[in-house]
Every structure is written in C-alpha cells, then in structure tokens.
Amino acid sequence: MVSVSVMGAGSWGTTLAKVFSDAGNAVTLWARREELASTIRDSHENRDYLPGITLPESLQVTSSATEALEGAAIVVLAIPSQALRGNLAEWKETIPQDATLVSLAKGIEKGTHLRMSEVIAEVTEADPSRIAVLSGPNLAREIAEGQPAATVIACPDENRAKLVQAAVAAPYFRPYTNTDVVGTEIGGACKNVIALACGISHGYGLGENTNASLITRGLAEIARLGATLGADAKTFSGLAGMGDLVATCSSPLSRNRSFGERLGQGESLEKAREATNGQVAEGVISSQSIFDLATKLGVEMPITQAVYGVCHRDMKVTDMIVALMGRSKKAE
C-alpha cells in the first residue's frame, strides 16, 4: 500500500482515485471547489463529473492542496493540459520531494509546444526520471463501472514505472510499463484531434469507411510526428497509440468525438461549447498547438491541419473533405 494524491476531481481524476483505492492504497482526492469536495465526502459520489458511481468509503477528499499532497509517494496530476502550468506553480513548494509525478493530461502546451512531462519538469524542477505518464484506451465511465481495461505507465525510471504499475493494478485495470514517454504523450495528445475528425465525419453523415480511413491515416501522421521527436515506433501500435486512438475515435463516451459530431452537424464552436456545459474538448485546443508544432518541425499532418481549419479558421466541413481527398497521390 502506498499513499496516493490525485489532484483533480474531474471524471478521469475521480475514476483513477477509485482505481487506486480499489487496488488497496491510501488515496486522497483533491477538488478545487470545497462544495464539490464536501458533496463527494458526504455522498461518496461525484455527481458533477461521474454521476451514478459509488466511490470507496476509504477515499479521502479535500479542497486543500497542502492537505492532499502531504506525505504522498505518488502524485497523480489530473489537470487539463492548458491549466497544468498554473496549478503546478501553486503546488511547487508542497509536492513531496521524492514523489513520483504521474501525468494524466493529454495535450501540447500552447505557445511553448511542450509536452506535459516537460511542463511538469520545468515548473517543479523535478528530474525527468521522477515523471511518469499514464495513457491508453481509458474511457473514464467504463473503468469507473469496473469494465476491464488496460493502460500504459511510461517513465524513464523503470523502478518508478513498476511502483505506479503495482499501485494502480486492480482486478479490472491492467497496467503495462514502457520507457517511451515521448511516444506515449504524443499518442495521447494527437488522438484527441483525430477523434474530433471522426466526430465531424459522423456528424456530417459519413460512414464507417471514412471513420476507418481517418483512424488509420491519423495514426500514420501521429507516428510521423512521434518519429521526428524521437519516439519508439512500437509505441504507436500499442495501447498508448492505436488502443487509445480507436477508443477515443469510436465511442460516444468520448468528449472529443461527441464535440466533433456537433461541429459536423453544423453547430458553431460556441454552440457546441454551450451544449457541453461550457467545456471545450481537449482536441480543439490541441489542434492548434499540434499543428503549430508540426509546422515548426516540417511534419505533414493533413488531418490535424483540417481539424485546425474547422476549429480555428472557419473552414466548412465540405472544404475539409475536399482538402483531404484532393491531396496529391502517393504510396501508403
């Protein structure tokens, strides 16, 4: 048993807190709002983000970051990618010095083009060997319901990866390890953009051939970007690559796919946001930062470019289709 702090009480953070608890650890979940923390403490349910799921009575919940982080051996960072830097700056002096930091965020930081593990290292000044990434085909509600799933723990330090692996292994949750942090993060960040494309396609009324083509060619451009950044090619055929991509592109539980469907049906970004309680899918923001990074590195990512066009340049879906189908002929 280890002491685990989960910083962030959204659907995924709450789910991972449940998994760590079910695996027999002492877990504290941090919620920014005391109102939410109090509700979870009293009802053992996160009605805002994970309604209908009963949380373990052993799970501690607080709105005090200092209280949540005290004595933690594993600190799970369940914070959206573009908010991670600001939160870490607040917690920097409170995070235990030798704790393993586990990133759940899937994105590339706007402006800096940094991966989330790089943001963590820069802000906290933690050695990269202390920073792990958890990623895979992990739709929160299915896991919270106890449906079997697998994931990847990527960390340069294999012993730390194994520590997290042992701590998060539950009867319904099987973690694997690798050392390819770059590939694991690139797969997780880019799949949100491809899922938006699949959602747009579905919302527009297109079928499974289109969906399969977007997933397959989407994986190809993700792997191109990963290779340029030094990732291991094998990562993209594994859980953090193809596994995560298929789940996110195919499931109605995927926020990115669902948001894309609304765009495909002709809704504006603002209307789609209103329909999702003011939340913008991660892929909308990531499409810009990933497109900018790809452009900077000279990596061809046509699907990402098209999604960026729809989300940020008022491109019509019909023009997106023409742009992708009208590209020059080439070998696969």
UniProtKB/Swiss-Prot annotation:
Pfam families reported for this sequence: NAD_Gly3P_dh_C, NAD_Gly3P_dh_N
Protein name: Glycerol-3-phosphate dehydrogenase [NAD(P)+]
SUPFAM superfamilies (UniProt xref): 6-phosphogluconate dehydrogenase C-terminal domain-like, NAD(P)-binding Rossmann-fold domains
Function: Catalyzes the reduction of the glycolytic intermediate dihydroxyacetone phosphate (DHAP) to sn-glycerol 3-phosphate (G3P), the key precursor for phospholipid synthesis.
Catalytic activity, EC: 1.1.1.94
Organism: Corynebacterium glutamicum (strain ATCC 13032 / DSM 20300 / JCM 1318 / BCRC 11384 / CCUG 27702 / LMG 3730 / NBRC 12168 / NCIMB 10025 / NRRL B-2784 / 534)
Pathway the protein takes part in: Membrane lipid metabolism; glycerophospholipid metabolism
PANTHER family for this protein: GLYCEROL-3-PHOSPHATE DEHYDROGENASE, GLYCEROL-3-PHOSPHATE DEHYDROGENASE [NAD(+)] 2, CHLOROPLASTIC
Enzyme class of the recorded protein, top EC level: oxidoreductase
Reactions that this protein is recorded to catalyse: sn-glycerol 3-phosphate + NAD(+) = dihydroxyacetone phosphate + NADH + H(+); sn-glycerol 3-phosphate + NADP(+) = dihydroxyacetone phosphate + NADPH + H(+)
Top-level taxon: Bacteria
Family affiliation: Belongs to the NAD-dependent glycerol-3-phosphate dehydrogenase family.
GO cellular component: cytosol
